[in-house]
């Protein structure tokens, strides 16, 4: 295990994250943890407020990592676990390069058995949201409530997420952090240079030739398998997940970003498919947990406090 230390490069952004989150209390203990998920692979994550059992588990989107939740979890202030999805952050890459939600869900469910012994609020952003939906459907006893951030099973990658897909699959190396930040801004990933610099720094590594490359596996695959079909032959590859969501008995909250991926049409479809679920809109772009951590924490806090226990 590695515990947060201001001198450790991995955790050097935490004091600034706390300021952005409006946190005045001392930083909680943050520990790097991991669990075996089979095939010789391990899933890595960050445990906040160790050694308390997590009350919320967070799953990031494609091309991100557990550290993307640091500002949000500091704002929320609850014991938490943020996982690096397979092929991301410090989690091992899949030999088959297959990062579809169903494969991710199997690994996440296995990791939760080891790292989250009590039922949790399960939150997933983007690809992590689809993954969380499948985990909640398959293991209802482990999930007190489900929060999905800015994605629905009705999303069409070609129509709704083309810029993000191209950003992940496009340029693979950079002269420095500034060049990667410039590309992120150009693709509408964000506009706050300081926040983007933090994110890029925590999501890149230096190659032998001195150039930077992304740490996640998706940037190293010619056709990363996330369920999205770049040829557009399956315009709604995630649609079968609606059926899984309809079996979830825990409360479900969709948090929609005001300038994100969930269009009015997708929000309407959500209401038709899941009339008992709740929708809240938060001002900000797709990566709300990075761009609007306090507002997202406010949207989630009441559900965290009121979600029914699982016995």
Question: What is each residue range found by the language model?
Answer:
Residues 38-41, 46, 74, 85-123, ...:
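Active-site loop/oxyanion-hole signature of alpha/beta-hydrolase fold enzymes
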Residues 44-90:
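Conserved HGGG/HGGXW glycine-rich cap/lid loop of the alpha/beta-hydrolase fold
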Residues 118-159:
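Conserved hydrolase catalytic core segment
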Residues 175-228:
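Conserved alpha/beta-hydrolase catalytic His-Asp/Glu region
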Residues 208-272:
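Conserved serine/cysteine hydrolase catalytic core
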Residues 273-286:
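Catalytic histidine neighborhood in serine/cysteine hydrolases
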């Amino acid at each position: 295990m590695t515990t947060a230390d201001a001198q450790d490069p991995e955790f050097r952004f935490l004091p600034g994250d706390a300021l952005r989150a409006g946190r005045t209390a001392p930083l909680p203990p943050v520990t790097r943890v991991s669990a075996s998920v089979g095939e010789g692979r391990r899933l890595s994550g960050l445990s906040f407020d160790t050694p308390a059992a997590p009350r919320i588990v967070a799953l990031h989107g494609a091309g991100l990592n557990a550290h993307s939740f640091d500002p949000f979890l500091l704002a929320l202030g609850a014991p938490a676990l943020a996982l690096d999805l397979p092929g991301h952050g410090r989690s091992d890459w899949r030999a088959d390069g297959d990062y579809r939600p169903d494969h991710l869900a199997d690994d996440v469910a296995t990791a939760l058995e080891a790292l989250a012994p009590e039922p949790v609020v399960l939150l997933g952003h983007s690809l992590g949201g689809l993954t969380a939906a499948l985990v909640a459907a398959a293991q209802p006893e482990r999930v007190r409530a489900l929060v999905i951030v800015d994605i629905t099973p009705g999303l069409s990658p070609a129509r709704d997420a083309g810029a993000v897909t191209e950003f992940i699959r496009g340029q693979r190396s950079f002269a420095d952090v500034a060049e990667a930040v410039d590309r992120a801004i150009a693709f509408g990933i964000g506009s706050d240079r300081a926040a983007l610099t933090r994110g890029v720094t925590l999501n890149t590594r230096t190659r032998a030739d001195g150039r930077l490359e992304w740490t996640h596996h998706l940037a190293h695959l010619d056709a990363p398998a996330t369920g999205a079909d770049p040829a557009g032959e399956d315009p709604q590859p995630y649609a079968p997940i609606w059926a899984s969501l309809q079996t979830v008995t825990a409360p479900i909250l969709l948090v929609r970003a005001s300038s994100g991926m969930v269009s009015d049409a997708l929000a309407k479809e959500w209401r038709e498919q899941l009339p008992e679920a709740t929708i809240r809109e938060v001002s900000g772009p797709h990566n709300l947990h990075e761009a609007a951590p306090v507002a997202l924490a406010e949207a989630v806090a009441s559900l965290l406090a009121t979600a029914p226990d699982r016995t």
